[in-house]
Regions:
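Accessible peptide chain termini
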Residues: 1, 356-358
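Catalytic-core regions of glycoside hydrolase
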Residues: 1-164, 170-175
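Catalytic domains of carbohydrate-active enzymes that cleave complex glycans
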Residues: 111-356
Length: 358
């Protein structure tokens, strides 16, 4: 109906595939359950807008399986530019690496090489601007707008190339410093911070496939929260921690979400031997003493990830202190204050998640 109404004016309908029925046992399954049977039935001026992951812009998710299940319907990507689940405008988290990871993912829909970048016809971004002079509340948050725009025009670009471009266009080389010294002592350290920042956030928020264990504000942790209104709004619904273990079973013995992916991914995710450890608790419910590739038990590995994330933010603080001669006083102070907040928040996450072990 909507597509027919706008068609005479050259209009298109971008229809979001964000579905979460409260009666479902697994929200990750719902987009495919809703849209796969409708493939090819939409008007020519309709495009289905799919979030990068199957839940909701988490620090790390596998790509949405719906990208591999529509053959006769145009698809577009929905990324999040703002940091709803990644520390708002207080944390240094560069989204370029997240976008690149998703766009380069192989769905195997038409065989090997069926990457998401080759399939999508457009890209949308969920953003949040304010009255701050840089619109974003944090100078480093601007890099996510830039990364989104560059990848929208050319999805083959690397996150590192985009970070290099943004840094050179954002910061001005001080007088009296040679280009070589500026690159070695400022550009490269800032780029290294940006390129590692997403993984740092994953470490101190939700490592090893943890997801949706935020408090109601989506800013801080809330693994104890249990919504009365809807189970699938609750962190306990997703981490499923009990005395026996932790994690969401999406294997063939659980919600069978793995089988919404094409082979070899379905079997890879289903098997503990081949599932990437970065997604382990996304697809598997495991005992606390499960041994990982490091030889450590699961609970010990979880704790080490949180400690590592905090240490990484501490390194950012030390690095930024060395960069004071290269930026204005206002920029230096802003970033220093934000990194202090980020470190405190990382410790908050670690302390809160220690309560998950029953």
């Amino acid at each position: 109906m909507l597509a027919e109404a706008v068609a005479p004016y050259g209009g298109i309908i971008m229809w979001r595939a964000f579905v979460y029925n409260p009666t479902s046992s697994d929200r990750a399954n719902q987009a495919v359950e809703e849209f796969k049977s409708l493939d090819g039935q939409f008007a020519d001026n309709v495009i289905i807008q799919i979030k990068n992951g199957p839940i909701d812009f988490q620090p790390r998710e596998p790509f949405s399986p719906l990208f591999g299940q529509l053959y006769n319907t145009p698809m577009m990507m929905e990324f999040q530019i703002t940091q709803e689940y990644l520390g708002f405008s207080n944390h240094l988290v560069y989204h370029g690496t997240t976008y690149e990871e998703c766009l380069d993912s192989d769905t195997y829909r038409d065989g090997k090489g069926s990457t998401i970048a080759k399939m999508v016809k457009a890209i949308a971004g969920v953003a949040n601007t304010g009255q701050d002079p840089n619109f974003c509340g944090y100078i480093f948050a601007q890099s996510n707008w830039y990364a989104f725009g560059r990848l929208a025009w050319d999805p083959t670009l690397s996150a590192e190339q985009i970070a290099n471009e943004w840094i050179r266009q954002t910061f001005i080389k001080p007088k009296g410093i040679t280009p070589t010294a500026y690159e070695q002592n400022f550009l490269i350290p800032v780029k290294d911070m940006m390129m590692s920042s997403r993984e740092t956030a994953v470490n101190y928020m939700m490592p090893l496939g943890f997801h949706h264990i935020f408090g109601g504000s989506h800013y801080g942790p809330g693994p104890w929260e249990n919504s009365i209104r809807r189970p699938d709004w609750s962190p306990v619904f997703y981490h499923k921690a009990d005395k026996n273990g932790v994690g969401f079973d999406r294997t063939r013995n659980g919600s069978a979400n793995v089988d919404q992916y094409h082979e070899p991914l379905a079997s890879q995710f289903n098997s503990l031997e081949t599932c990437p450890e970065s997604l382990l608790l996304w697809f598997h419910h495991l005992p606390w003493d499960y041994k990982l590739s490091s030889g450590r038990e699961l609970w010990d590995e979880i704790c080490l990830h949180y400690d590592k994330g905090i240490s990484q933010v501490e390194e950012y603080k030390k690095m930024w202190a060395k960069l004071k001669p290269y930026v204005s006083e206002s920029i230096f102070n802003e970033v220093s204050e934000k990194l202090d907040i980020q470190k405190n928040d990382a410790e908050w996450w670690r302390d809160a998640l220690s309560l998950i072990h029953i």
